[in-house]
């Protein structure tokens, strides 16, 4: 049986690494790209190179920065340091920014606690978070994590970790769909959940 040329197989193997993309989808995308004008494929390749060379996260809050040399927009003095929003991913930050309801600072956790897989929070990030709270002394820490098993476990851990501090700890209001990622929640629903957040 004849196999795909190596350049097709290699592309398919990389595409399969993307979330939600299986072999069939990767195969379809690869052959769709064969129909593109070579200049379009080259432009996409350059965009990927620029992405690799330019993307950077802030070492203090772990939000995405505009470039490796730029300062962090989310750590600027224009943000309200009395409110600290804890999120799971840099993408979650932009979900809240679209809702235009939060003007405070963020902290991106990255990995969440997983009772099933035994995954733990990054000790390094946890120490940086503690330092951020010590430096800025926010009056409220808003735990804005997905309503999933991992999100709930992480929220409970954070509550226990910081309950001794004179800081209000809250979670997004009930009504957020259980098990659903912020990716699938519209800005209005997110804004209502944020404004109606409860003490945790």
UniProtKB/Swiss-Prot annotation:
Superkingdom assignment: Bacteria
Keyword annotations from UniProtKB, A to Z: DNA damage, DNA recombination, DNA repair, Metal-binding, Zinc, Zinc-finger
Alphabetized CDD domains for the sequence: TOPRIM_recR
Zn-finger (C4-type) residues: 58-75
Any single GO BP term: DNA repair
Entry-linked InterPro entries: DNA_Rcmb_RecR (IPR000093), Rcmb_RecR (IPR023627), Rcmb_RecR_Znf (IPR015967), TOPRIM_dom (IPR006171), TOPRIM_RecR (IPR034137)
Domain Toprim: start-end pairs: 82-177
MF terms (GO), sorted A to Z: DNA binding; zinc ion binding
PANTHER family per the UniProt record, alphabetical: RECOMBINATION PROTEIN RECR
Family under the similarity heading: Belongs to the RecR family.
Entry function: May play a role in DNA repair. It seems to be involved in an RecBC-independent recombinational process of DNA repair. It may act with RecF and RecO.
Protein known as: Recombination protein RecR
Annotated organism of origin: Chlamydia muridarum (strain MoPn / Nigg)
């Amino acid at each position: 049986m004849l196999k795909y040329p190596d350049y097709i197989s290699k592309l398919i193997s990389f595409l399969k690494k993307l979330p939600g993309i299986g072999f069939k989808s990767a195969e379809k995308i690869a052959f769709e790209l064969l129909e593109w004008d070579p200049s379009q494929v080259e432009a996409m390749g350059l965009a990927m190179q620029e992405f690799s060379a330019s993307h950077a996260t802030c070492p203090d809050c772990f939000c995405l920065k505009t470039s490796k040399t730029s300062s962090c927009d989310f750590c600027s003095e224009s943000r309200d340091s009395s409110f600290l929003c804890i999120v799971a991913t840099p993408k979650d930050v932009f979900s809240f920014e679209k809702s235009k309801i939060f003007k405070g600072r963020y902290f991106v956790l990255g990995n969440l606690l997983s009772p099933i897989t035994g995954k733990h929070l990054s000790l390094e990030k946890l120490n940086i978070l503690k330092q951020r709270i010590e430096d800025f002394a926010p009056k409220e820490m808003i735990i804005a994590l997905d309503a999933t098993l991992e999100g709930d476990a992480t929220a409970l851990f954070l509550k226990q970790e910081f309950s001794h501090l004179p800081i209000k700890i809250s979670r997004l209001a009930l009504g957020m769909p259980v098990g659903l990622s912020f990716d699938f929640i519209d800005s209005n629903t997110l804004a209502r959940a944020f404004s109606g957040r409860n003490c945790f």
